[in-house]
Structure formats: structure tokens, C-alpha cells
């Protein structure tokens, strides 16, 4: 038998493996997972009932067009069906966008540090990442991002709020940036955490999309809606882009379970957003407590907080795990910590208080 292996694409060799948030391992009687920005609340009863009604049809393929969900989204956002596309979470839709726009020789711009899937899916597409450092305040440097545009730029990600820092881009600076972007470059406003924003100066990406044909908005049901395990996200974009997204979608990628749960969640939006409000209040408590302890915390508008710890990052993550909470470390930089159950947040704050005294 030949020892020659099948030939694979050379650009795949350098792709880092995506690192999900570490699961909660029992460090004590109770362990809490604050590493993946998940919603700590279980699905609403109505959502569970909707999912249960789909169980008997597992032998059938899902509605490939996501017709029911698309209709609900069209009504909810006031956009034409032709301006919508769905996928397996917003990261799945982001990958479809790259497949539709970018390839070898093209460039994709995004802030760094930002969502860690961006470099992975960019490299998979064959395009080149152009990473623009955040400002010292951990905010997108939009002027530098605009300066980085070349004739090879095909797509720009703006993560708003930014993951993992929670910081935001406000309306005036975003509009100035968009004015500098050529009309043939697609700007993707990744708004996975949109529902947690309380700053009135942060624009709704859908309003921006209505005014600018080269803007696409990404949303997900994973965070505020609590459907992370079902993998459903969507894009709102003008027809040429949305049509390309539908062409690059994995056939039958969004399960019927996910579609039905997403529709039920949209219909129960008021109740779900009440839960989001409770998480925002808890976020404010956590941030205030950290600042009282002497920590410098960026102004977060997401469901997580960011602590810069530099070389002490892994030590801090280990201390949290030993106490019974799992956080998301970025070695040499800092930790991202989800705002979770009140009990979990209290444990985290006890660790930060002890650790602060050791610095």
C-alpha cells in the first residue's frame, strides 16, 4: 500500500484550532462555567414545547429554506425575505460570507484581539488576515482599520460589542469609518451581543444596513435567546450579499429543532429580554465590585467582563477553577468572564478580591 497521503491545501497547516470555553469540571461540590458567554437561564417552557413537537420528525430533513424562521425575522426586523440568510450560528454565517467574498490574494480586516474565529475562518477561505490592534482602551481603532484598506481588501469585520473585551463602537465613529470604506468592500457588523447593549450611542446595525448597501449585520440566537446548543444565526444584508449567503449555506445545516426553537423564542421575546435585563443588572454589579476592588475594567456592553492580567493570566484562571468557576483565559493577555448565575459571580468576585491583594 502506498505511503503517500492525500494532498491537502497548504494553507490549512497553519490554522490554529478553535478553543471553546473550558467545561466546568468539578473542582468542588459545584462548578460553574463562565467561559463561553452562555445564557445561564434554561430555555423557556414554550421553547421546550416547540422543540418537543419536532422530536417525532427526526427521520425527515429540516426545511432547507428555514421558511417559518425567515418569515418571523422578516416581520420582526421589517426587512424583505430576500435580505435574509440563515446559518449554523453567526459564526457559520460569517464563514459563508468569506466563502462568498474572499479567496487567495484577498485581505480581510478585523480588530485584534477580537472574536478568535475570525483568523481561523479567514485562513480556511484562503484569504489573508489583516489584524489591527485595539486601542489602549481595548476599543476598535477604526481610523487604523480604515488606513489598512487596500485594493485587495474584500471584507471587514466590526465586532460590536467586541468579544472578548465587551467594548463598543458608537454611532459617530462608525459612520465616519464607513464613509472611508470603498463601496465594493463588505463591512460585517457582528452583533452577537446586541441585546445586552444599554449605551444609547451604540447604533443598531440594522439601521445602518438600511442606509448602506455594503453593510451586513450578523445576529445569533446563541446568547440572549439561550439557544447556543442548537446553532442558529442569521444575516441581514442587501440582496446580492444575502443571495450569495444562501448559495454558500450548508444544505439542511439548520436543524428543524433549531428553527422551531428560534421561532418560539422570537414569539416570547419580551420574556426573554426580561431575562437579559436581569443579566445586565448583574453585569453592572460585577463591574462595580471589580472597580471597588481596584481593577481596571473596560466599559462592557456584553454579557461578560474582560480583565487584563498579562503574565498572571493562567495563574488567575487556575485560581478561579480551584474555587469552582471556569473562565476563559487568553495566555499573556487576560481573561474573559461570563456574567452567569449570581452564585457563580459571587465566587468569581471572591477570587478577584484575593488575587488583587497578591498583585
Swiss-Prot record:
Q: InterPro entries in the record, alphabetically?
A: Aminotrans_II_pyridoxalP_BS, Aminotransferase_I/II_large, ArAT, HisP_aminotrans, HistidinolP_aminotransfase, PyrdxlP-dep_Trfase, PyrdxlP-dep_Trfase_major, PyrdxlP-dep_Trfase_small
Top-level taxonomic group: Bacteria
User: What Pfam families does the entry give?
Assistant: Aminotran_1_2 (PF00155)
Q: What is its EC number?
A: 2.6.1.57
- Alphabetical keyword list: Aminotransferase, Pyridoxal phosphate, Transferase
Q: Which cofactor does it need?
A: pyridoxal 5'-phosphate
Molecular function in Gene Ontology: aromatic-amino-acid transaminase activity; histidinol-phosphate transaminase activity; pyridoxal phosphate binding
Q: Which reaction does it catalyse?
A: an aromatic L-alpha-amino acid + 2-oxoglutarate = an aromatic oxo-acid + L-glutamate
Identify residues that carry N6-(pyridoxal phosphate)lysine: 223
A single BP term in Gene Ontology: L-histidine biosynthetic process
Cite the CDD domains for this sequence: AAT_like
Query: What does the subunit section of this Swiss-Prot or TrEMBL entry state?
Result: Homodimer.
What task does this protein carry out? Aminotransferase that catalyzes the conversion of aromatic amino acids and 2-oxoglutarate into corresponding aromatic oxo acids and L-glutamate.
Family listed: Belongs to the class-II pyridoxal-phosphate-dependent aminotransferase family.
Q: What is this protein called?
A: Aromatic amino acid aminotransferase
